[in-house]
Amino acid sequence: PTSAPQDVNSIQITIADKQTPLVLLVGPPACGKTMTLIRLARFLKEKGYQLEPVRTLRPSTDKAYLDLCNNFNSMLSTPLAAEATNLISFMLVRVLDKGKVICQILEAPGEHYFNPNDPRSPFPTYLNQVFADRMRKIWTFIVEKDWRDEQNRLDYVQRIRDIQLQIHPRDRALFLFNKIDLTGFVIGRGRVNRAAAKKDVEDNYPGIFEPFRNTHPITSFWKPWRCEFLPFQTGTYTVDNSNGQLYFQAGADDYPAALWQRLLHFIRG
């Protein structure tokens, strides 16, 4: 949105709740982060959870963000895919179950985490602040098959290593293989050859899981990795030829259901 300040280091965000676990969606631009948030949010609403945008994330002068908070629920139900992804640059959503806060989910621009055109750029000040915040974090790294070219993928692996250095032992890490429907690994509705999918990620993003290898002399026998791996699909996207609009049709519930189960497991563990 045009209201975003030009200098990335002047961006201010405030996460006031330092107790509730924070889910971070991490990935390059256009990896489907925003639609992942929307798909999960839709699923949770249907399951009876309450979703609340946190208005204090951005300064009150950011009218675009306040509009976004006001229109959040209607945006969850719109079939127009582009509307959501164009509008959301920042979003902090609290997930509640019968009024009790379960977690908060942060969406921030992908290029602030990793810009393929400037892969070694320092993290913006506000992200360093989030990294340092004391609440438990669940780092959700988004990957996809055949993403850009080899050098971009290697740069992304390096970026994940840089982020991993910020991860506290109490935190949890999850790799989300998005757009799984565009791969050959789906064997049925919501059923995926997960081992083959994970190997494909290892082959195409060499060393991506290495920072998460469990080096503990005992527990590593039954848990070699300190990260989880899940396939994901937001849905299908079709262009209406009459108006050029991109429409979104939610995919199988199995994917957001599995993601939520994993997040709950992390939150409680």
Regions found by a protein language model. Give the residues of each.
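Short, flexible loop/turn elements at secondary-structure junctions
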Residues: 27-29, 97, 109-112, 233-236
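Catalytic micro-motifs at enzyme active sites that drive phosphoryl/nucleotidyl and oxygen chemistry
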Residues: 10-13, 78-83, 90-95, 127-129, ...
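Conserved GTP-binding G-domain of TRAFAC-class P-loop NTPases and closely related GTPase folds
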Residues: 125-269
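Switch II of P-loop NTPase G domains
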Residues: 84-95, 99-136, 147-159
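Charged, amphipathic alpha-helical linker segments immediately N-terminal to NTP-binding catalytic cores
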Residues: 1-2
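Conserved G1/Walker A P-loop phosphate-binding module
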Residues: 5-83, 100
